[in-house]
Regions:
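Short glycine/serine/threonine/alanine-rich loop segments
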Residues: 1, 73, 140
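Nucleotide-activated donor-binding/catalytic signature segment of Leloir-type glycosyltransferases, i.e.
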Residues: 3-44
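Positions that flank functional sites
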Residues: 11, 83-84, 150
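Loop/helix-junction capping segments adjacent to catalytic residues or to phosphate/diphosphate-binding pockets
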Residues: 12, 109-110, 143
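Short aromatic-enriched loop/helix-cap "lid" or pocket-rim segments at secondary-structure transitions
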Residues: 16-18, 89, 149
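Short low-complexity, flexible loop/linker segments enriched in glycine and/or proline
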Residues: 19-22, 91-93, 159
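Catalytic binding pocket for nucleotide-activated donors in carbohydrate/polymer assembly enzymes
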Residues: 39, 44-132, 136-137
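C-terminal alpha-helical cap of glycosyltransferases
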Residues: 142-159
Length: 159
């Protein structure tokens, strides 16, 4: 496999750790770290990737998983904020929507290792392909959200 990290981080210590990681694996040509953001590169990576890992501690909305779903790149996310509202997994007690990714609770290395292991074990199986099909069907347009907002506004303006 190939690991690519793209992101912005002002923390010098974190940048140094990822730079060292890339240097350590440089001879394999399988690790690439990109600091900064390039929309064209991001689109190409989403379209080419099999998985997108978003292990956020906090995520009020989350666009990364939405881009991922759009390109049928299976999101692997921590159940928090907007990630929890848009990515559904069989591991959820009662998934209300069709499964379209992998979710985990524990914000630690064990949690990430567990979910990545689970995702890799299912890679290219019927379960993985079902997630891809469901990912393509996710409606991320404003159509439904707009209708919901209009209903709220109607309720609060009619006394």
């Amino acid at each position: 496999g190939v690991f690519i990290l793209v992101g912005l981080d002002g923390d010098h210590h974190v940048r140094k750790l990822f730079t060292e990681l890339e240097e350590t694996w440089q001879h394999t040509n399988r690790v690439r770290i990109v600091f900064g953001f390039n929309p064209k590169l991001a689109e190409q990576l989403f379209a080419a990737a099999d998985f997108c890992i978003v292990p956020s501690y906090f995520e009020p909305c989350g666009l990364t998983q939405l881009y991922s779903l759009y390109f049928a790149t299976i999101p692997i996310v921590r159940k928090t904020g907007g990630l929890n509202d848009t990515v559904f997994d069989l591991a959820d007690a009662t998934p209300t929507k069709p499964i379209n990714g992998y979710t985990f609770l524990d914000a630690d290395i064990e949690g990430v290792n567990w979910i990545v292991g689970r995702a890799l074990a299912e890679f290219l199986t019927p379960s993985y392909k079902e997630r891809q099909k469901n990912a393509c069907k996710v409606d991320i347009s404003w159509t439904n959200s707009t209708k919901a907002y209009l209903e709220v506004y109607k309720k609060i303006t009619s006394f």
